[in-house]
Amino acid sequence: MLAYLEVVPTLGITRMSDHHFGNVLEYNRLRKNTKLYKKFTGYTHILFHELDAFVFKDELLYWCQQNVDYIGAPWVYRTNDARCLLHKGVGNSGFSLVHVDHTIRSLEKLNLSAGRTTVAQRASLMKLGRHHKLVRTEINVDVFFSFLAENDPEFTVASFNQAVKFSFELCPAELFEYCQHELPFGCHAWGQYDRDFWIPIMNLFGLGKKQISFRKRAQKPMSPGKKIFYLKEKSIISLNGNAHSTNKESG
């Protein structure tokens, strides 16, 4: 924290109890607790930038103006077809932007501030055909914002096409092709997924190999999803059965 103050002496710091950061479970509870967001009601948005995130562009104001309440890197998974990725939703919370007031409202409405669901809520989620992790008692913060919040008509989650311009996490090389070799606003877990892709890019941003510490993480097994897009020579895609093209050739 002192390093930040050396760069920006006027930086304001809000401290939280250490127990919130002792393990993933406690951190997830914090991220779903209205008390966190009520500390920042003087602001419209919170940008969550965990230690393994990185910002490429000065676009924060732009993203705050996009009329979405939650945005993070899209969840995509490789398939047996090298041209095909399975899109499961939006998105990762390690580098994410949330609307403060709307998040408070949604948390209070769904009564999930403590990170727990009732039997009735779990049954409802099962009827919706959601992934099995959605029905466990402790709901991960990523899952909460990307799926549970979709059931609140007043809470807006970013679309895939918005999220892919906001951040990469899984399958960054494929998403880079999809975006016609344009980097997003930022990324998350760049030291864990596809290091061969990230090392040259991070070198361009001043991070030499000696400064990069990797903890390699295998990509999670693919589970059922509804949205499929196909990668071809220049990222010609088909999303949800509708053809789209990122170049002039659409063969």
Regions found by a protein language model. Give the residues of each.
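Active-site-proximal specificity loops/subdomain of glycosyltransferases
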Residues: 2-44
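Short His-Asn-centered micro-motif
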Residues: 49-50, 72-74, 92
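Catalytic core and acceptor-binding pocket of nucleotide-sugar-dependent glycosyltransferases
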Residues: 90-242
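A short acidic, often aromatic-flanked loop/helix-cap motif at beta-alpha or helix-coil junctions
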Residues: 16-25, 78-79, 165-169
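Long amphipathic alpha-helical coiled-coil/heptad-repeat bundle
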Residues: 43, 85-86, 130-133
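Conserved donor-nucleotide/metal-binding helix-loop-beta segment in metal-dependent transferases, i.e.
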Residues: 54-85
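Short beta-strand-to-loop acidic/aromatic patch adjacent to the donor-nucleotide binding site
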Residues: 43-55
